[in-house]
Amino acid sequence: MTELPLEAYYDLTQLTDISISPSGDRVAFVTTEFEATEETTHSSLWVVPTDGSRDPHRLTQFGSASEPAWSPDGSRLAFLASRDEPIAQRVGWTDRGDDPETDSTDEEPSDAEAAGDDEPTQQVWLFDLERGGDAYQLTDREDGVASFDWEPDGTRLVVGARDPTDEEREYVERRREGGPIETTRLQHKLDGVGWTDDVTEYLFVVDVADGSIDRLDDAYGGGAFQDLTGLEPAWGPTGRIAFTSCRHENPDDTMKRDVYTIEPDGTDLRRLTDGEYNHGQPTWCDDGSLGFTRSDPENWYEPTEAVVYDGESTTSLTEDLDRTIARTATLNWVDEALYTLLADHSQTRLVRATVDEGVDWCFESRGSDRALLGLDVSDDGSTAALALSHPQDGHDVYVVDVDELESSRAIDRTADLPTDDPETLARLTDLNADLRRQCSMPDVRRVEWESDGWTIEGICYADPELDLESGDHPLVVAIHGGPLSYDEPIFSFAHAALTSRGYVVLRPNYRGGTSFGREFANELYGQWGTTEVADVVAGVEELIGRGWVDPDRVFGYGFSYGGISQGYLVTQTDIFAAAAPEHGIYDPFSCYGTGDSHNWFESEFGLPWEDADRYERVSAIRDVDSLTTPLLITAGGEDWRCPPSQSEQLYVAAKKQGVDAKLIVYPDEHHNIGDPDRAIHRLREILAWYEAYDPAVEDA
């Protein structure tokens, strides 16, 4: 077999956003690529016809691009971007015939420039696809734009943007210049944001023709994670604008969010929901009803539901199905039917639901050998665009006729969801052809095993040239994060790097994951370090029992809750020859209040000064005297989901026990490994760590 070079990571193309035109004739999508010479990441916006008559056309190449959205008539394409001068010549220009090379040195500085920040801020940009030419910048908000939506007639946009007072602006400027951090907020940190401030996000209405902008004073945000979720504005057919916000007495002390609507002139604010749930993704139907998601703010293991508000009451479309809306799902209306994505066992399924029937059928994404990552349905209801990830092909854009979807058979909602495999998908892209030519991509198998009376599923990856039955192969157990997540067959550079070097990779869907129903997920609620440990150990024993892997050559890694699980596994068992807990939490008691997860911890374990025993029971550090496994521990220097101090504690505890350990901290990195050089470094270090403690390598 041919090893995948780690430097080939620079050839990886990731698919992040898809948006289908109103008539279904084109798909806009965003890819993320890496620049080796500059060690940077670029996001590019593309358009491709759905009939496959032309190859994808790249509209942007440098800077960033995200969240493309077509105007209602399909003539313009709006998106969010942070772009440097001199591309941004004008703000809200009205004469599209002017020379785009016009010198802007005599113009007044923009709000973003006046703010004194050298980095470009994220703004709304527009392509006029009928006239052609480069995109032009529509907004010029000082702190950028977080989200937007089109007015149904296409003449205006509603945008969500921060709007600091003079005092708040002065503080933000002092912070940018290295001044002291000052906060009175309970949610004092947020991963990916850093230390939070008091600046409020509002909705603004922007005229597309001249760029004029008006703030809706009553449409403002609030809540612990507001800086991440945004206001999620949606402009409806009745003229009203829907958005989400938390208006509780102490919005940082709850995960509850409500859905509001308001007139575009800022009058007649209404709250549609009861203040008891976490609501999100408001999406209008043509008849004026409003769909959105609803989840339990106190128990995050409960399924997220799709619900509809008809002007008087709210009805759940998925409550009886015992499955959760997938985390990557959007809500899409066709007439009075809602199309969305559900998590079901080890895969994501496209389903249709109505108020009268609930979920009445399911379209399976051409077999269960790939992951369905995204969905968008054209406004005319003719065509659906899908983002699919195949372990051997990569991430790509597909389309399917909605009429073909609706030919799928009805399902018995008391039984398992069926599998339909119509040959109707049309592939529009081949984003990772160059990468695939460098080695064989892994084969995928689904495996099952028993654990405490439960049937557990896992996804197993191996090189197609590997003879699994020979039984002497090294195994890597890769544990998903969340834990409110799940694994499904997916394209992964890390999987390919490992399998091309002879490793078998197992990704177990342990109890606590969200794709097997309410009872399965709640097995882990408040019980960290119990059920998932049993499920992982049983999965390893299953592969050993099948004769696929060498019991002395079992290794592990996991990121976020996967790292947390690694901490439990190495302090409770000795199944690993070496392990790599990444960006994890190993003592929730000392972690409480140092990151952004105080509401999460309180919902599962209570308050540490009131429930110290519960925190003690879920601390991996308490069992560190049993640790013998060599550990490669990683952390992000600015990770406020799983703070780096947690990795330091585990590292020092391991060294005190005389266990081989290495700590890697990525400066300025949050709960992620973003830069390509760091992603390559991470994989190189993990591979070297495994090799150093592989008995077969030692014998050789």
Predicted feature descriptions by range:
Residues G24-V27, G74-A78, L157-V158, I241-F243, ...:
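Hydrophobic beta-strand positions that form the internal "hydrophobic ladder"
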Residues R90-Q122, R162-A209, I213, R257, ...:
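Predominantly five- to eight-bladed beta-propeller fold
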Residues D421-T424, T429-D552, F559, C591-W600:
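Cap/lid segment of the alpha/beta-hydrolase catalytic domain
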Residues M1-T13, V48-S66, D84, T105, ...:
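Multi-bladed beta-propeller domains
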Residues R511-A700:
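Active-site-proximal cap/loop segments of hydrolase catalytic domains
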Residues E33-T37, R83-A88, D163-E167, T196, ...:
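Short glycine/acidic-enriched loop and turn motifs that connect beta-strands
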Residues I20, W70, W150, W235, ...:
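Residue-level recognition of a conserved intra-blade site in WD40 beta-propeller repeats
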Residues E7-S44:
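Beta-strand-rich domains and repeat architectures in extracellular enzymes and scaffolds
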